[in-house]
């Protein structure tokens, strides 16, 4: 069962009545309560809807139960605001008495709630939030990330841009907060180590309405622009890029969230040819994704997105972990360690397993926006298999460097 609050009403998922001795014991222990928070209002509302829908699709397919216990999902709207996210997590834990919490979009929210779940020893899953240091320099024992670290997909793009796209002089224009910094920083580091130069770095506020001043200030001697955007900002920036005449003159590449399916549907021909990197594409050609994408579109009448598949995967992690401990989620440490041990060979995203710090090792896909059958899609043009959050670097040496931020790596070629 999924319970929403406020205007979101009550949504029921299919629940099968378990039978047999194991089911009876599960019933005696009561339902497993999962607190799920997502931005169901504000600029990232569509993202939040995709998250909830992907999460609930898995539980519907699983019959609303695992290990003989029913699963109850309690949903909260955190409005895409980090402080609100912390408030909602506290409510889920202290009022709703959930066994575990999951959700969130913005990396800043991930950093905001981490101290609370750590202090209160709450098994927590980050299906989407990508703050690097949650699984790097400041690992949080009680958090398992089933998504990816913010720079995990941009390291490969730095390699691809130089070696395969032939780009040499780049600028960046990204959202001015931790995900933008970390994602762009990963790209810059690998691109420059490959021999390229980032000659300008621009940052835009999350409430930006007019990209004109930023685009007008772009250097004229660049052959490409790297951008990190998400949500409604992606559509706003893509239109501005075309309106200012850059399309076809300067290569546009970036984080996969920039052309994710949940925003791509609102774009037009201005998006054609844009190359991005991500852990997923709705048109990935593997049996698990074909099943998932078809089921998602059939149920919700829209294409699967990064956020829907990430949440679907998170639910799968819960299912496998809870099954492995025979439903004993009351033993929090056992539950947490079971989550960390999950390996999935047939996820829609491809094979996944956790590293020692609780972050997936998984494929990163280079995608190009094309129109196929009258519909825009992220066609996979290259695959980097089994990518670690540390790329090809030695883990211990990598962790000695500073966290990617607004000023690191420094812009050595800016003048």
Specify the residue positions occupied by each region the protein language model found.
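Hydrophobic h-region of N-terminal signal peptides that target proteins for export
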Residues: 14-22
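Extracytosolic ligand-binding ectodomains
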Residues: 3, 8-13, 25-415
